[in-house]
Amino acid sequence: LSAAFTFLFAGCNPSTQPSDIVNSYDLSLSYDKNSHTLSGGMRFYFVNECEEEISFLLFNLHANAYREGASYPAVAKEYSSSAYPNGKSYGNISITSVKTDDSALNYEICGEDENLLKVHLSAPLEQGNNVTVEIMYSVKLANVRHRLGYTNRSVNLGNFYPILCYMENNAFCEYPYYNLGDPFVSECANYNVTLICPESYHVAHSGSKISEQKNQDGTTTYKFKADTVRDFALALSENYKVLSGTADNTTINYYYFADSKAESTLELICRALITYNELFGNYPYTDYCVAETDFCYGGMEYPQLVFISSGLVREQYVSTVLHETAHQWWYGIVGNNQISSAWMDEGLSEYSVMLFYKKNPDYGDFDTKLK
């Protein structure tokens, strides 16, 4: 773990100097529960830190993996029946405009599977210079128990917006949406997010909630802020109950449907965060949300937010909470390429779970868990 600790302080940490984390996303979102559509606008601020000028920006369009006819569909065949209990359903992302400084920019949908948005800049961007690009888009959600989709009681908004492709050796990396494992890799950035949704929804979120304003039309406007994180996600439900607690300097919010042991789950989340703080260094964020949701896998990690499947039995639920919480360090704070080096964050997260059991024997015998 010594190498990992070395990288810990060079990863996503809000105490990092602002000049080290330069890109930012301002997202304005509106969710229509009748059409299951998320309308969005994004202002993306980018500084060229490459050693040479660049003439375009490249963004991942992960939402297009849910469209009909996708060559790299989001859901693997072996999970299809679990993900689509009501039959196949499709979604996609549509780009409606791209501009900068009120001037339209040329763009194209490209990649192996219409999974990339290429934005051509009006002039080459030299090293150290910056540009702000505005992208308007609309996401149609599929009826699917997955990272991005809706069911009769939850709306999962993971990997929904255009996100800048990871850069390596002064070039953008292009990856399709592999449906086994986590097909994502991104640098840290700052996020300011505004969401308008029906007031009946409770919203689990990345970042911190800055404000909540009820509107006369029956909607609520939420504002969130997340600094130096690798992504931003949300989970919405009209059925959520919420329990809150604290772990060291972090506020914990647990969103659940019908967990008969909800108080124990909240205590588990707090204990996990405290244990990992002691083992790996303090969690650098003030808020952490755990959201039970309809999901065909065990769980999914996002910065300051994790999804936990509603279909797990208790023992699986506990181990998944521990595993996904460990991902806050391994992938979140300590970054790695989750596509080419999945063994790293997954291996360290599972190892962290074993360390938790060793330090907290009241949650299970370490030797038994190790077997």
Protein language model features and the residues they cover:
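Asparagine-centered strand-capping/turn motif at beta-strand->loop junctions
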Residues: 46-50
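Zinc-dependent metallopeptidase catalytic helix centered on the HExxH motif
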Residues: 306-368
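Short strand-edge motifs at loop-to-beta-strand transitions and within beta-strands
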Residues: 115-119, 131, 220
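Extended, low-hydrophobicity, Ser/Thr/Pro/Gly-biased non-transmembrane segments
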Residues: 43, 82-91, 96, 133-235
